[in-house]
Amino acid sequence: MMNHTPLLLGIRERLIFALDVPSRTQALEWIDQLGDAISFYKIGMELLASGEYFQVLDDLASRGKRVFVDLKFFDIPATVAGVIRRLSQWPISYCTIHGWHAPMMQAATEANTSNMHLLAVTVLTSMTREDLAKMGINREPVDVVVERALAAHMAGMSGVIASGQEAAAIRRAVGSGFSIVCPGIRTNHVPHNDQQRTIGIKAAFANGADAIVVGRPIRMAQDPQAAAEAMQTEIMTALTEPST
C-alpha cells in the first residue's frame, strides 16, 4: 500500500531525538531523562546490534512516543519488500530506505500494509562533493539529492532524509505533501563531528523541513532536557513567526 501522504506531526513532534545508544538500559535512561521534552525517537543500527531493538521499540510505543526506525535498508527489491511487510506489524511512524534504486523503493511502498511512512535516504549529511566524486558521482550534492527525492516521490515514498541545506531545492522540485526530515542539525558551539552539510534549526525550517533529527547536540549538553526544550521553543518560533 503506497503511503504518499506525509505524516501529520504535532508541533512538538518535529524534534526527533537520535537514540544512538548500545543497550536498552541506556535507552530507557535517556527516555526517562528527557521526559516530555521529546515525543519522537529515532532508533538505529547501534541499538539493533544489542539484540534489544524491538524491546526498545515497544518501550517507546508503550510510553506514547513516536518511533523512527532508521536502518537504511538497501538490498534487492524482494528482500526490502519482505522486511517492510514484517515491519508493518509494528507501531512505527518513520522507516528509512536508501534512495539509490527506484525499483527497490517501489517494492517497499507496495509492501507497506500499515500507516508506517517510508523515507528515502538521499545523500548522507556526512558526505561532501569530494566524497561523491570518489564514488564516480561528479555532481553537486544538491543535484543528487533532488534527483533522488524526485525518484522517491514517483515511487510513492512519503518523503526523504536530506540535509536542511537542500530542503528548499527539494521543496521547489517536489512541492508540498512530501516530508523532508533533516539530520545534521548543529547549534552554536556544538562541534560538527563527522557531519559535513550542517544547518541550524531556524534555517532548516525556513528551507522547508518538516522535522529535524538531533542527537549529539542534546546528548552532549550539560542539561539535555533543557537543551531539548530550548530547541522545541526555537522550532515553535520558526514555524509561527511571519516569514520575511
Swiss-Prot record:
Catalytic residues of the enzyme: K72
Q: Does the keyword Mitochondrion apply?
A: no
Q: Name one GO biological process term.
A: 'de novo' UMP biosynthetic process
Q: Which GO terms describe its molecular function?
A: orotidine-5'-phosphate decarboxylase activity
Which pathway, metabolic or otherwise, does it act in?
A: Pyrimidine metabolism; UMP biosynthesis via de novo pathway; UMP from orotate: step 2/2
**Per the UniProt record, which EC number(s) apply here?**
4.1.1.23
Q: What domain of life?
A: Bacteria
By its UniProt entry, which NCBIfam families does this protein fall under? Answer: PRK00230.1, pyrF
The record's listing under HAMAP family reads:
OMPdecase_type1_B
Family designation:
Belongs to the OMP decarboxylase family. Type 1 subfamily.
Subunit structure of this entry?
A: Homodimer.
Q: What is this protein called?
A: Orotidine 5'-phosphate decarboxylase
Query: What is the scientific name of the source organism?
Result: Xylella fastidiosa (strain M12)
Q: What is the lineage of its organism?
A: Bacteria, Pseudomonadati, Pseudomonadota, Gammaproteobacteria, Lysobacterales
Q: Which gene encodes it?
A: pyrF
